[in-house]
Design a protein with these regions (language model features):
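RNA substrate-binding interface of SAM-dependent RNA methyltransferases
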Residues: 1-88, 140
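Eukaryotic short linear interaction motifs
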Residues: 8-10, 44-46, 88-91, 107-110, ...
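Calponin-homology-like cytoskeleton-binding modules
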Residues: 81-83, 91, 95-102
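C-terminal folded domains that constitute the principal catalytic or ligand-binding module
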Residues: 96-187
Length: 187
């Protein structure tokens, strides 16, 4: 099973490097690890340097890194670009697909940027089934966002792949700060 992290590096590179470290650590601990590949990961780029600076042993990480685009590595009909703006719900994980997690970290959220990129490339898209399995929290502190960090998306995928349970997977990856909770947690 393949998960490819697209490195769309904007201004928050240290956060992305940290998310890559967390994602990698979660994959190492997973009962069913994924094959990981960082694509468009240019040697000497800011994110490249930041990954080596922030992540001890990064050069020994058991994952592939390449400057190439995922479009050059995989058939387009095998690619599923995960984006919170997709109309398509990810219902299951297909071991014959390559799932793209867009490594976009930017404080000024660009609405539908990952969806737009996937459409421009004529790729299948899907979103995690947050709305289907979770409800909005009534807390006024929460702003109800389905946009997750790449390590959180990975945690959801990994837990689902292990348990085949979306509620368990979403509980593992969607923090309460996103403003969603499982219905049985609503009191």
């Amino acid at each position: 099973l393949h998960v490819t992290v697209l490195v769309i590096c904007w201004k928050e590179t240290s956060r992305l490097a940290s998310q890559i470290r967390r994602l990698y650590g979660a994959n190492r601990r997973a009962e069913k690890p994924f094959w990981l590949c960082l694509t468009e990961f240019a040697v000497g780029s800011l994110i490249y340097k930041e990954c080596f600076r922030m992540n001890d042993g990064f050069s020994s990480y058991l994952m592939d890194t390449t400057q190439e685009s995922y479009l050059d590595l995989f058939p387009s009909d095998a690619i599923v670009y995960l984006t919170p703006d997709s109309e398509n719900v990810l219902e299951d994980i297909d071991p014959n697909k390559v799932y793209i997690l867009g490594g976009l970290v930017d404080e000024s959220i660009h609405k539908k940027l990952t969806l737009q990129r996937a459409r421009e490339q004529s790729l299948q898209t899907a979103r995690l089934p947050i709305r289907e399995y979770m409800v909005k929290s009534l807390s006024s502190k929460n702003y109800h966002s389905e946009t997750l960090a790449i390590n959180q998306v990975f945690d959801v995928l990994s837990k689902y792949y292990e348990t085949r349970s979306w509620p368990a997977a979403l509980k593992a990856g969607v923090s309460s700060g996103k403003g969603y909770m499982l219905p049985d947690a609503v009191k």
